[in-house]
């Protein structure tokens, strides 16, 4: 969407901003105008932070997390449990689990999920490294923390089959009622999963 009275530099800025998740042409235009109106307070510091991140941040060669160090701070932490590896789709999922503080083992970022529609195949994901890691002597459990989508569950089944001979326990996150959730507002699939995952009180 071309912006009237905007030069090529502004058009390029808007075009690049529009490529970010959740930003369409209108939102990108508003963001660009906001940045241009706050050059010293926001635009220049943001440009410096982006350049710094582009130069210094890389994917961890062990788990796939994003960090300035390799291995990342999570992999390098001596107090993490080596017996369990939690498999996630994205780095954002890893960060969400870390915020929750519920998992104390190691992580593995796949970099996506299998998808026939999007043409994502096993060789497009970080699966070979996962199989290598799961074969290590100290690993006894692989936790599949993938999204409850068709592609996520297809990927989980593929991984379970692929690692069947690795002599590890393969588990997945429980599905069901979220903390603070009301039954009347939950979808049918979530309610059905909650019943299947019910436990003794």
Swiss-Prot record:
InterPro entries hit by this protein: DNA_Rcmb_RecR (IPR000093), Rcmb_RecR (IPR023627), Rcmb_RecR_Znf (IPR015967), TOPRIM_dom (IPR006171), TOPRIM_RecR (IPR034137)
Record protein name field: Recombination protein RecR
SS bond list: none
Function text: May play a role in DNA repair. It seems to be involved in an RecBC-independent recombinational process of DNA repair. It may act with RecF and RecO.
Matches recorded under CDD domains: TOPRIM_recR (cd01025)
Record-annotated Toprim domain positions: 83-178
Annotated signal sequence range: none
Phylogenetic lineage: Bacteria, Pseudomonadati, Pseudomonadota, Alphaproteobacteria, Maricaulales
Record family assignment: Belongs to the RecR family.
Gene Ontology molecular functions: DNA binding; zinc ion binding
Zinc finger (C4-type): 60-75
BP GO terms, sorted: DNA recombination; DNA repair
Keywords: DNA damage, DNA recombination, DNA repair, Metal-binding, Zinc, Zinc-finger
One Pfam family linked to the record: Toprim_4
SUPFAM superfamilies hit by this protein: Recombination protein RecR
């Amino acid at each position: 969407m071309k912006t009237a009275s905007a030069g090529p530099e502004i058009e390029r800025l808007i075009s690049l901003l529009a490529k970010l998740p959740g930003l369409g042409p209108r939102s990108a235009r508003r963001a660009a105008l906001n940045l241009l109106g706050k050059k010293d307070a926001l635009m220049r510091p943001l440009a410096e932070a982006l350049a710094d991140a582009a130069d210094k941040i890389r994917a961890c060669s062990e788990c796939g997390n994003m960090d300035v160090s390799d291995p990342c701070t999570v992999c390098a932490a001596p107090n993490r449990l080596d017996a369990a590896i939690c498999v996630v789709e994205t780095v954002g999922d890893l960060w969400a689990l870390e915020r929750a503080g519920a998992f104390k083992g190691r992580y593995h970022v796949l970099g996506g999920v299998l998808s026939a529609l999007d043409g994502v195949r096993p060789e497009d994901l970080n699966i070979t490294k996962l199989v290598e890691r799961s074969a290590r002597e100290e690993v006894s459990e692989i936790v599949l923390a993938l999204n409850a989508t068709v592609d996520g569950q297809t990927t989980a089944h593929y991984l379970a089959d692929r690692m069947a001979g690795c002599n590890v326990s393969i588990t997945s996150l429980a599905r069901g009622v979220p903390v603070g959730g009301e039954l009347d507002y939950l979808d049918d699939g979530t309610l059905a999963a909650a019943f299947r995952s019910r436990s003794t009180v």
